[in-house]
Amino acid sequence: AKFCEQVLSPLNRVGDTEGCTWSESGVKTPTGFKEAYKQFVEGGWPSLAHDAEHGGQGLPESLGLAVSEMVGTANWSWGMYPGLSHGAMNTISAHGTAEQQHTYLTKLVSGEWTGTMCLTEPHCGTDLGMLRTKAEPQADGSYSISGTKIFISAGEHDMADNIVHIVLARLPDAPAGTKGISLFIVPKFLPNAEGGVGERNGVSCGSIEHKMGIHGNATCVMNFDSATGFLIGPPNKGLNCMFTFMNTARLGTALQGLAHAELGFQGAIKYARERLQMRSLTGPKAPDKAADPIIVHPDVRRMLLTMKAFAEGNRAMVYFTAKQVDIVKYAQDEAVSYTHLTLPT
């Protein structure tokens, strides 16, 4: 809470006014973002809800979500950088080989590397069966990935040593439509023999979007030019595997609504306590001032309580779902049924 209040919250305005800066060499995040991420990593926060086997703390998903709510309420733009890594970790953990888990999870869990989700292309978003990004098999068992992905949140930045892209692509002999999609790990830098950052891969950011909001987070056009990729899961079953990432993102999207609702409520109640206007119907509440704060007026209180009710309702559903995700790990049938309802695959 102290980190969110004292470090992230002040950077929210900085991120919104300054935004990200694109150049051919990469993306520069707003002033202070990189330093805040360093503190976040040093505090061990990225590892909170991940397995101890890969350096995590092994705590419940619901506890990790509580931390993410504080981060997101303080600074959603900043929080998306480590937030998307969570989905990448879950996907590699669920579908990656033992070697892939060894290579990528320790770095992602520690926060040294971050992750992204690369689905959308210029000609297709919701209809992923139309995607054109190609994956050509190579003699060494890797794949050559070629194509363009758009609207990639945190696709390029200067906050971590490496960025691990989880990419949907199509094999040469793949069936048409969604039944012919495969999933790949495509890192910005290829890992070296020691597990650190090696040579640059054929991945680059072509531009960043100029958005209405969340200016502090880079929403990128990502170009894959014969980039080396590694298959996750079975061929042509990539969309099934990607649903692991998408369900993590669904919880994150719900959390975004909660974070903004909570922040809006906090701002509104602060203003209502400061803004003076007329007197209370039951007599002066601030007789030493020219008028009473508007929080004393019934209609203002009604609006504030409505805001609070929506935020609390959202919070209840998000945390209940996260709790069911935790219980699912122990194969409880009722929890499985509930998550199939709220996080459909």
Specify the residue positions occupied by each region the protein language model found.
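A short core secondary-structure module
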Residues: S142, S146-R200
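Internal maturation/activation junctions in enzymes
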Residues: C20, Y81-S85, G96-Q138, A322-S337
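Short Gly/Pro-enriched turn/cap motifs at secondary-structure boundaries
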Residues: H123-T126, E156-D158, P175, K211-N217
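Active-site-adjacent bridging/hinge elements
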Residues: F33-W45, G64, S142-I145, F230-F243, ...
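Extended amphipathic alpha-helical segments enriched in small hydrophobics
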Residues: R250-A331
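Conserved small/polar residues in nucleotide/adenosyl-binding loops
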Residues: T339-T345
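Amphipathic, small/basic residue-rich leader segments at the start of a protein or domain
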Residues: A1-M80, E99, T103
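A glycine-rich, basic-preceded beta-loop-alpha segment at the flavin cofactor/substrate interface
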Residues: F151, L190-G206, K211, A218-A249, ...
